[in-house]
Amino acid sequence: MKVILTSDVDKLGKAGEMVNAKTGFARNFLLPNKLAVQATKENIKIWEEKQAELRAIERENIKKANELKEKIENTKVKIIAKTGEGDRLFGSITSMDIEKALKEQHGLDVDKKKIEMKDNIKSLGTFNVVVKVYPDINANLEVIVDKE
């Protein structure tokens, strides 16, 4: 029996997918628990319209992500930090510091969780940091750490 899933179902599919399910499983579990709707002509038409809307939204999100990627890659973030002997930093520069500097210096709002660093920055110099803008879209940001 063809059904359109309204929720994620283990070993069957994700919400919004049209799948073939065994008749008994669909009638006794999926439909009564509102995990799926039967794939009638009317429901298929509604499902196709929703899929078209989702694809349009996805294209718009990708377009915005690419614009943000361009902005990030065309900017440099300069962070001033206190240093001790041998130009070693007191503390370190974290993704939160980079997020704050991006917002203050360029007005770009990027979540600190999307800024990927192998380790915190602990010395002066220029560093490249990866910013995950969208799934499969990454931007390279140049971070310049200078002493006070």
From Swiss-Prot:
GO terms for molecular function: rRNA binding; structural constituent of ribosome. The keyword Ribonucleoprotein applies. It holds the Pfam family Ribosomal_L9_C. Gene3D superfamilies: Ribosomal protein L9, C-terminal domain (3.10.430.100), Ribosomal protein L9, N-terminal domain (3.40.5.10). The keyword Chloroplast does not apply. One of its GO terms (cellular component) is ribonucleoprotein complex. One of its GO terms (biological process) is translation. It comes from the Bacteria. Keywords: Ribonucleoprotein, Ribosomal protein, RNA-binding, rRNA-binding. PROSITE patterns: RIBOSOMAL_L9. InterPro entries: Ribosomal_bL9, Ribosomal_bL9/RNase_H1_N, Ribosomal_bL9_bac/chp, Ribosomal_bL9_C, Ribosomal_bL9_C_sf, Ribosomal_bL9_N, Ribosomal_bL9_N_sf. Binds to the 23S rRNA. NCBIfam families: L9. Belongs to the bacterial ribosomal protein bL9 family. This is Large ribosomal subunit protein bL9.
